[in-house]
């Protein structure tokens, strides 16, 4: 799952363990006296199915390759950037690093990750689409393998939508943003809302969905430097959300500071007709929905950019300090064989990036909305901020508070633009001197 769609509780549990184990890293006897190589693999899998699938694959590798042993180290999505930075700077990073593509830029430019360009097998590079490889390409190097991704979809109360008589969107005929706004109006009233936007972490949702409306926000000049420009296409999604909350009263104002999991009880109780969530939230719905609750997966609205949507795939990288890079890449090649990629995707309730894995019948079934998700795969693009140095600081110090204030009604669109552009460009400039 993407980082902002994981439960805090799960993050905390694995985070405590990760802080202890992370420091073991690459420095602990990578080659034994008997000549066997030991590689430490820090995995951020956290759902039970995902953890089990990953551990099983590690065990299978070790059984087949006794001369190259992989040790599974449990990591945590919570504060992973700071954890990795500390371990890299201390020379104690794991050999194989599980992360997300939007977190790699500083590590790649900082020399902490190995350039995999000449190490990756052709089977793997040809199976994963070029757009996915763009998400892990920084400068002239490739610093990770993108392997799982998830679109943002609408999880809907199927009965309520059917009773309302609204047109049900499909990937072939999605709602426009204007139609989506109108539908949420029709589904609202008597204390119920057409939609609940969980925007505790508003930046990735806003930026990634804005690709569908032609938004870009980050613009790279001929000199390679990036500037922020909040243009017409960037306005569509935030303006729609703001109007749903403030003008239409079709979106719940109380969920703006909530995480995705916090909205599920309201969805089950009929308070919200729809909730925009990451594709992997389907697992929680299957586990938590009351008996008899009927739900369906709908594509997010489309605009000038069609169904385009930004994603930050989960990635697997090799530490630059790892003394056994070829062996580490051989393990990645095994882990990401099509049949194994399917197992990882099913375990995390996400989409694989590999073409062969994506074609697997297990991921094409209508059950639990899998078919809707796979239909969106061709429209997924690297998140807008993918290669922007300084993005974490821009997001935390500028964009998050600005968007939160805008969605709450504390500031208007003009002030939002000013903060994102003026304050944001000051932050980015420090990283591009």
Region locations from a protein language model:
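Conserved N-terminal structural module of periplasmic/extracytoplasmic solute-binding proteins
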Residues: 2-4, 11-106, 279, 304, ...
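Extracytoplasmic/periplasmic substrate-recognition and gating elements
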Residues: 63, 164, 243, 247-251, ...
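Glycine-centered hinge/linker elements that transmit conformational signals in sensory
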Residues: 184-186, 223-256
């Amino acid at each position: 799952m993407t980082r902002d769609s994981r439960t805090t509780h799960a993050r905390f549990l694995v985070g405590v363990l990760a802080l202890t184990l992370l420091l073991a890293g690459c420095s602990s006897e990578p080659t034994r006296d008997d000549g066997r190589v030991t590689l430490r693999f820090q995995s951020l899998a956290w759902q039970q199915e995902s953890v089990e699938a990953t551990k099983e694959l590690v065990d299978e590798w070790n059984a087949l390759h006794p001369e190259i042993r992989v040790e599974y180290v449990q990591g945590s999505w919570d504060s992973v950037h700071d954890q990795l930075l500390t371990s890299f700077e201390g020379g104690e990073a794991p050999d194989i690093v599980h992360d997300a593509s939007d977190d790699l830029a500083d590590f790649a430019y900082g020399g902490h990750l190995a350039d995999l360009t000449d190490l990756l097998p052709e089977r793997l590079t040809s199976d994963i689409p070029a757009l996915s490889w763009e998400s892990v390409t920084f400068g002239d190097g490739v610093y990770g393998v993108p392997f799982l991704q998830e679109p943002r979809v609408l999880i809907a109360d199927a009965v309520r939508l059917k009773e309302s008589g609204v047109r049900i969107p499909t990937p072939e005929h999605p709602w426009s943003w204007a139609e989506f706004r109108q539908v949420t109006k029709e589904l609202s009233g008597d204390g119920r809302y057409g939609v609940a936007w969980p925007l505790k972490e508003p930046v990735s949702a806003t930026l990634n969905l804005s690709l569908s409306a032609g938004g870009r926000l980050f613009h790279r000049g001929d000199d390679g430097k990036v500037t922020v420009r909040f243009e017409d296409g960037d306005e569509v999604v935030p303006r729609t959300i703001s109007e749903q909350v403030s003008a239409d009263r079709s979106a719940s104002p109380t969920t703006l500071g909530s995480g995705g999991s916090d909205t599920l009880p309201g969805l089950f109780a009929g308070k919200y007709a729809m909730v925009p969530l990451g594709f992997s939230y389907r697992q929680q719905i299957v586990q938590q929905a009351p008996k008899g609750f009927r739900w369906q997966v709908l594509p997010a609205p489309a605009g000038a950019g069609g169904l385009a949507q930004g994603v930050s795939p989960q990635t697997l990288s090799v530490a630059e300090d790892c003394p056994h890079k070829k062996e580490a890449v051989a393990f990645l090649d095994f882990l990401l064989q099509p049949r194994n990629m399917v197992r990882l995707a099913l375990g995390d309730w996400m989409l694989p990036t590999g073409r062969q894995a994506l074609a697997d019948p297990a991921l094409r079934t209508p059950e639990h909305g899998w078919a809707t998700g796979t239909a969106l795969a061709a429209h997924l693009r690297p998140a807008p901020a993918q290669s922007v140095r300084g993005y974490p600081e821009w997001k935390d110090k500028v964009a998050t508070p600005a968007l939160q204030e805008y969605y709450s009604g504390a500031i208007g669109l003009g002030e939002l633009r000013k903060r994102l552009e003026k304050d944001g460009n000051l932050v980015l400039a420090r990283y591009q001197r």
